[in-house]
Amino acid sequence: MRPSQRSADAMRVVRLTRSYTKHAEGSVLVEFGDTKVICTASVEETVPSFLKGKGQGWVTAEYGMLPRSTGSRMRRESAAGKQSGRTQEIQRLIGRSLRAVTDLAKLGERQIVIDCDVIQADGGTRTASITGAYVALADAIRGLIDAGKLSATPLRDQVAAVSVGVYKGQPVLDLDYLEDSDCETDMNVVMTGSGRFVEVQGTAEGEPFSEEEMAAMLGLARKGIAELLAHQRQALNV
């Protein structure tokens, strides 16, 4: 039995609250159970130097955790003077996931920066960040269309992410912290609305996993992501 008493194929309660902050062009509070992340999208009328004059835009992301988002206080990475390898890996994953569903040529020479700030962590912060970041990005793009700066959306598809794993010998969906810290296998899956994979990150923490277990985990991920895509559409009223 899972610590949360959920069935193996059950997601935590998911909420997407749009327009959560006042200033950003797009903002969302995403909740996967007790994991809570604020995702904001900021439009900048400039592009990185490597894209100047090329007629296309860029979508990138930054990720961070508040010092007391976890059980004991963490030192701010800005105070330490450098980002951890984990932080860099996660923010690159978020950026890759969003660019996978964005036609950068249609975005024009502008950049949209997504900031994902974890205010409470209980497992799945990167997958919650990707899922919420898409909604924040979509809202920022709607604003550009409404302002007449874009004639059509550059978004080609939705994108969402979920964790799966093997916990006490059973493949399970959407691991919370207790499961994540005690699982035999941990996997993060990022998929588009059309059912294509952006990324699959899987690691055996102890006993190696079988091909059958991998297939079961991917099946659970498809189910969970289908639910997340529906949550996104409902939040965006599409």
UniProtKB/Swiss-Prot annotation:
GO terms for biological process: rRNA catabolic process; rRNA processing; tRNA processing. One of its GO terms (molecular function) is tRNA binding. PROSITE patterns: RIBONUCLEASE_PH. Signal peptide: none annotated. Keywords: Nucleotidyltransferase, RNA-binding, rRNA processing, Transferase, tRNA processing, tRNA-binding. SUPFAM superfamilies: Ribonuclease PH domain 2-like (SSF55666), Ribosomal protein S5 domain 2-like (SSF54211). It catalyses: tRNA(n+1) + phosphate = tRNA(n) + a ribonucleoside 5'-diphosphate. Its EC number is 2.7.7.56. Phosphate binds at R86, G124, T125, R126. Gene3D superfamilies: GHMP Kinase, N-terminal domain. It comes from the Bacteria. Homohexameric ring arranged as a trimer of dimers. Phosphorolytic 3'-5' exoribonuclease that plays an important role in tRNA 3'-end maturation. Removes nucleotide residues following the 3'-CCA terminus of tRNAs; can also add nucleotides to the ends of RNA molecules by using nucleoside diphosphates as substrates, but this may not be physiologically important. Probably plays a role in initiation of 16S rRNA degradation (leading to ribosome degradation) during starvation. Belongs to the RNase PH family. This is Ribonuclease PH. It comes from Chromobacterium violaceum (strain ATCC 12472 / DSM 30191 / JCM 1249 / CCUG 213 / NBRC 12614 / NCIMB 9131 / NCTC 9757 / MK). The lineage of its organism: Bacteria, Pseudomonadati, Pseudomonadota, Betaproteobacteria, Neisseriales.
